């Protein structure tokens, strides 16, 4: 489930293990409580209160999930969950293979808000798979282009490369300021991919990676070394 509706109660009672055992939606090494409902309308959530977080400390140290092009950046979560069944990953169980999305307008509104508030020019998308819906990612790119929002943005958490459908999508990503995409092929072994239950189209993946190179979008591939 999602933490928003129980976060305050959890933080207030962090030191009280007996109390935490009664809050649904929590899992620890000692207990696994019942699930809680997901937030169905992600657009209904407020933008993150980054003003209450020591962003300057992270900027000074250069800490980030993806490589930095600017001194200042902010993380964005434009969707939650993942529809794929990979058996090495906790997400299919915790999110029931559901991919929930924010509207492109809501995401771009958040970007605009933090550009104005913090003079930030770089955004790191932390979604597990922000490119699952091709029409949605294109709409998001087009909104950034139409609004003339001058930013760099990166997909940093390892999106499924085949969910990037075409060279047209790559071109829009580039025009909107995307200059880095982390992808997750996991392995070059088709036998291992079957074992981890991850469908993968190698031919399409290679085509998209070549398209990234052509559009000068830096790519990083994540691999699993050793699978029990």
State each model region's role:
Residues 1-41:
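Glycine-rich beta-alpha loop elements in corrinoid/cobalamin-binding modules
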Residues 48-220, 225-227:
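Radical SAM [4Fe-4S] cluster-binding motif and immediate context
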């Amino acid at each position: 489930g999602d933490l928003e509706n129980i976060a305050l109660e959890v933080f207030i009672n962090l030191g009280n293990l007996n109390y935490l055992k009664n809050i649904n939606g929590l899992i620890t090494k000692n207990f696994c409580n019942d699930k809680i409902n997901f937030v169905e309308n992600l657009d209904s959530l407020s933008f993150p209160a980054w003003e209450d977080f020591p962003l300057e400390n992270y900027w000074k140290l250069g800490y980030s999930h993806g490589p930095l092009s600017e001194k200042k950046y902010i993380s964005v979560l434009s969707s939650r969950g993942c529809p794929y069944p990979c058996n090495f990953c906790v997400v299919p169980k915790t999110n029931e293979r559901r991919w929930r999305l924010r509207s492109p307008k809501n995401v771009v509104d958040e970007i605009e808000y933090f550009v104005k508030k913090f003079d930030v020019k770089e955004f790191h998308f932390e979604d597990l798979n922000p490119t699952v819906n091709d029409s949605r990612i294109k709409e998001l790119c087009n909104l950034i282009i139409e609004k003339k929002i001058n930013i760099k943005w990166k997909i940093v958490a390892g999106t499924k490369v085949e969910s990037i459908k075409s060279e047209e999508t790559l071109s829009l990503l580039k025009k909107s300021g995307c200059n880095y995409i982390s992808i997750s092929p996991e392995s070059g072994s088709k036998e291992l991919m079957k074992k981890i239950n991850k469908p993968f189209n190698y031919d399409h993946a290679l085509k998209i990676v070549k398209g990234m190179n052509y559009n000068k979008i830096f790519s990083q591939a994540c691999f699993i070394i050793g699978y029990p």
